[in-house]
Amino acid sequence: MLVSLGALRVLLGIFFTLTGAAKLFQVSAPVSQQMKALFEQFAEVFPLKVLGYQPDPISYQAAVGWLELLAGLLLVVGPPVLQQISNVLLILLMMGAVFTLVVLEESLSTYIPAVVCLGLLLLLDSCQFLVRTKGAVRCRNKIPGALGNPRK
Protein backbone atom coordinates (compact mmCIF):
# COMPACT_ATOMS: atom_id res chain seq x y z
CA MET A 1 0.00 0.00 0.00
CA LEU A 2 2.87 2.37 0.77
CA VAL A 3 4.31 1.90 -2.72
CA SER A 4 0.99 2.73 -4.39
CA LEU A 5 0.56 5.79 -2.15
CA GLY A 6 4.05 6.94 -3.06
CA ALA A 7 3.35 6.44 -6.76
CA LEU A 8 0.06 8.35 -6.51
CA ARG A 9 1.79 11.18 -4.63
CA VAL A 10 4.55 11.41 -7.25
CA LEU A 11 2.12 11.32 -10.19
CA LEU A 12 -0.08 14.03 -8.65
CA GLY A 13 2.98 16.10 -7.82
CA ILE A 14 4.31 15.90 -11.38
CA PHE A 15 0.87 16.72 -12.79
CA PHE A 16 0.44 19.82 -10.63
CA THR A 17 4.04 20.92 -11.26
CA LEU A 18 3.43 20.78 -15.01
CA THR A 19 0.04 22.53 -14.87
CA GLY A 20 1.50 25.22 -12.63
CA ALA A 21 4.41 25.75 -15.02
CA ALA A 22 1.97 25.99 -17.94
CA LYS A 23 0.12 28.80 -16.12
CA LEU A 24 3.34 30.69 -15.38
CA PHE A 25 5.33 30.33 -18.59
CA GLN A 26 4.05 30.88 -22.11
CA VAL A 27 3.83 27.46 -23.69
CA SER A 28 2.42 28.79 -26.95
CA ALA A 29 0.55 31.93 -27.94
CA PRO A 30 -2.90 30.30 -28.45
CA VAL A 31 -2.69 28.38 -25.16
CA SER A 32 -1.61 31.51 -23.28
CA GLN A 33 -4.45 33.55 -24.78
CA GLN A 34 -6.99 30.85 -23.93
CA MET A 35 -5.70 30.62 -20.36
CA LYS A 36 -5.84 34.41 -20.01
CA ALA A 37 -9.47 34.40 -21.18
CA LEU A 38 -10.33 31.60 -18.74
CA PHE A 39 -8.80 33.44 -15.78
CA GLU A 40 -10.75 36.57 -16.71
CA GLN A 41 -13.91 34.47 -16.31
CA PHE A 42 -12.60 32.85 -13.12
CA ALA A 43 -11.82 36.26 -11.58
CA GLU A 44 -15.43 37.34 -12.17
CA VAL A 45 -16.77 34.54 -9.94
CA PHE A 46 -13.93 34.50 -7.39
CA PRO A 47 -15.34 33.13 -4.08
CA LEU A 48 -14.18 36.15 -2.04
CA LYS A 49 -15.97 38.55 -4.38
CA VAL A 50 -18.90 38.62 -1.92
CA LEU A 51 -16.49 40.15 0.62
CA GLY A 52 -15.45 42.82 -1.86
CA TYR A 53 -12.23 41.28 -3.16
CA GLN A 54 -11.85 40.55 -6.84
CA PRO A 55 -8.37 39.63 -8.07
CA ASP A 56 -6.69 40.86 -11.20
CA PRO A 57 -6.91 37.97 -13.72
CA ILE A 58 -3.17 38.04 -14.49
CA SER A 59 -2.25 38.02 -10.79
CA TYR A 60 -4.84 35.31 -10.14
CA GLN A 61 -3.33 33.12 -12.86
CA ALA A 62 0.17 33.71 -11.50
CA ALA A 63 -0.88 32.92 -7.92
CA VAL A 64 -2.60 29.69 -8.95
CA GLY A 65 0.37 28.76 -11.13
CA TRP A 66 2.91 29.31 -8.34
CA LEU A 67 0.74 27.44 -5.85
CA GLU A 68 0.40 24.45 -8.19
CA LEU A 69 4.08 24.50 -9.11
CA LEU A 70 5.44 24.72 -5.56
CA ALA A 71 2.87 22.40 -4.00
CA GLY A 72 3.46 19.86 -6.77
CA LEU A 73 7.22 19.97 -6.23
CA LEU A 74 6.81 19.62 -2.47
CA LEU A 75 4.42 16.72 -2.98
CA VAL A 76 7.19 14.89 -4.86
CA VAL A 77 10.40 15.82 -3.02
CA GLY A 78 9.36 17.55 0.19
CA PRO A 79 9.54 16.18 3.73
CA PRO A 80 6.36 14.46 5.00
CA VAL A 81 5.07 17.55 6.83
CA LEU A 82 5.38 19.73 3.72
CA GLN A 83 3.87 16.96 1.59
CA GLN A 84 0.82 16.97 3.86
CA ILE A 85 0.55 20.78 3.78
CA SER A 86 0.87 20.87 -0.01
CA ASN A 87 -1.75 18.13 -0.33
CA VAL A 88 -4.20 20.16 1.77
CA LEU A 89 -3.46 23.32 -0.24
CA LEU A 90 -4.08 21.46 -3.50
CA ILE A 91 -7.33 20.04 -2.10
CA LEU A 92 -8.50 23.57 -1.28
CA LEU A 93 -7.42 24.77 -4.72
CA MET A 94 -9.37 21.98 -6.44
CA MET A 95 -12.43 22.72 -4.30
CA GLY A 96 -12.18 26.32 -5.50
CA ALA A 97 -11.84 25.12 -9.09
CA VAL A 98 -14.96 22.97 -8.82
CA PHE A 99 -16.84 25.88 -7.19
CA THR A 100 -15.78 28.19 -10.01
CA LEU A 101 -16.91 25.74 -12.70
CA VAL A 102 -20.27 25.25 -10.97
CA VAL A 103 -20.88 28.99 -10.75
CA LEU A 104 -19.89 29.46 -14.39
CA GLU A 105 -22.32 26.64 -15.31
CA GLU A 106 -19.72 24.86 -17.43
CA SER A 107 -20.43 21.54 -19.11
CA LEU A 108 -19.95 18.30 -17.22
CA SER A 109 -16.91 17.38 -19.30
CA THR A 110 -15.19 20.52 -18.00
CA TYR A 111 -15.65 19.37 -14.39
CA ILE A 112 -14.06 15.95 -14.87
CA PRO A 113 -10.35 16.88 -14.52
CA ALA A 114 -10.94 19.00 -11.41
CA VAL A 115 -13.19 16.40 -9.77
CA VAL A 116 -10.79 13.54 -10.56
CA CYS A 117 -7.83 15.50 -9.16
CA LEU A 118 -9.84 16.43 -6.07
CA GLY A 119 -10.85 12.80 -5.56
CA LEU A 120 -7.29 11.55 -5.94
CA LEU A 121 -5.95 14.21 -3.54
CA LEU A 122 -8.63 13.29 -0.98
CA LEU A 123 -7.82 9.60 -1.43
CA LEU A 124 -4.12 10.30 -0.90
CA ASP A 125 -4.84 12.40 2.18
CA SER A 126 -7.16 9.86 3.79
CA CYS A 127 -4.87 6.89 3.05
CA GLN A 128 -1.85 8.71 4.45
CA PHE A 129 -3.88 9.55 7.55
CA LEU A 130 -4.85 5.89 7.96
CA VAL A 131 -1.24 4.76 7.55
CA ARG A 132 -0.06 7.28 10.17
CA THR A 133 -2.78 6.39 12.69
CA LYS A 134 -2.37 2.65 12.13
CA GLY A 135 1.32 2.99 12.94
CA ALA A 136 0.64 5.17 15.97
CA VAL A 137 -2.07 2.92 17.44
CA ARG A 138 -0.28 -0.39 16.96
CA CYS A 139 1.22 -1.65 20.22
CA ARG A 140 3.64 -4.53 19.85
CA ASN A 141 4.41 -5.25 23.50
CA LYS A 142 1.74 -6.02 26.02
CA ILE A 143 1.97 -3.89 29.11
CA PRO A 144 1.12 -5.65 32.37
CA GLY A 145 -1.94 -4.11 33.94
CA ALA A 146 -3.04 -2.39 30.74
CA LEU A 147 -6.67 -2.65 29.72
CA GLY A 148 -7.89 -4.10 32.97
CA ASN A 149 -5.47 -7.03 33.22
CA PRO A 150 -4.34 -6.97 36.86
CA ARG A 151 -0.69 -7.46 37.68
CA LYS A 152 0.17 -10.66 39.45
Swiss-Prot record:
Signal peptide range: 1-21
InterPro entries named in the record: DoxX, TMEM35A/B
Keyword set includes 4Fe-4S: no
Main localization, broad class: membrane
Pfam families: DoxX_2 (PF13564)
Keywords carried by this UniProt record: Membrane, Signal, Transmembrane, Transmembrane helix
Spans traversing the lipid bilayer: 62-82, 85-105, 111-131
Membrane topology designation: Multi-pass membrane protein
One Gene Ontology term, aspect cellular component: membrane
Annotated compartments: Membrane
Disulfide bonds: none
Similarity field: Belongs to the DoxX family.
Record-given protein name: Transmembrane protein 35B
